[in-house]
């Protein structure tokens, strides 16, 4: 959960009593920045091969995965990537426990501040259950299917290169490519069981 306060800690810049769902224009620009760069930030927020098994998990018997698989925001909607649970704050639901906590926070700031600086528009909120009805939403962007797709998006992102610095992005992408290559070069039990007789 996050909000943005002034230096005194007394004014929440994300709160506006007259704003939709109690959020300010600044908060919506921040959300839009996070949505804009979410796919490129996946390699940082979801840095392991197994992260993408969580993101793209099938719906459980409860009707949810508790992990978003598309790039969207909504009110008190646990099927969206960004949730607005109450006035003056947002919940970012994409990140997993494998993320470096410092890079995770830096990524939020890079993307959110880019949204504010460029007055990005998040579009209309989605109130549908995206697990059950996501196919009905036209133009809904999906999150990367695997770590390699995420790495490639990180590498191409101007927002991340500007925010983190080109040298960091190059080094990070090189490290993640090395990890992906190591994974791709290993033979899993599933492959042994299902493909060795091909």
Predicted regions and their residues:
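Active-site capping/gating regions of soluble enzymes
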Residues: 1-126, 132-140
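Acidic, glycine-enriched catalytic cores built around paired aspartates
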Residues: 130-198
């Amino acid at each position: 959960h996050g909000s943005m306060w002034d230096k005194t800690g007394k004014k929440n810049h994300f709160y506006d009593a007259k704003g939709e769902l109690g959020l300010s224009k600044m908060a919506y620009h921040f959300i839009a920045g996070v949505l804009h760069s979410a796919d490129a930030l996946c390699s940082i927020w979801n840095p392991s091969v197994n992260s993408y098994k969580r993101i793209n998990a099938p719906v459980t018997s409860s009707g949810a995965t508790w992990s978003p698989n598309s790039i969207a925001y909504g009110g008190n909607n646990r099927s969206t990537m960004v949730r607005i649970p109450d006035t003056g704050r947002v919940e970012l639901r994409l990140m997993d426990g494998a993320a470096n906590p410092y890079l995770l926070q830096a990524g939020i700031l890079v993307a959110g501040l880019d949204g504010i600086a460029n007055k990005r528009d998040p579009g209309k909120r989605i109130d549908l259950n995206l697990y059950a009805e996501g196919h009905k939403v036209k133009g809904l962007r999906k999150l990367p299917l695997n770590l390699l797709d995420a790495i490639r998006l990180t590498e191409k992102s101007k927002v991340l290169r500007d925010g983190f610095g080109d040298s960091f992005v190059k080094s990070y992408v090189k490290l993640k490519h090395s990890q992906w290559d190591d994974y791709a070069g290993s033979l899993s039990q599933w492959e042994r069981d299902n493909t060795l007789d091909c």
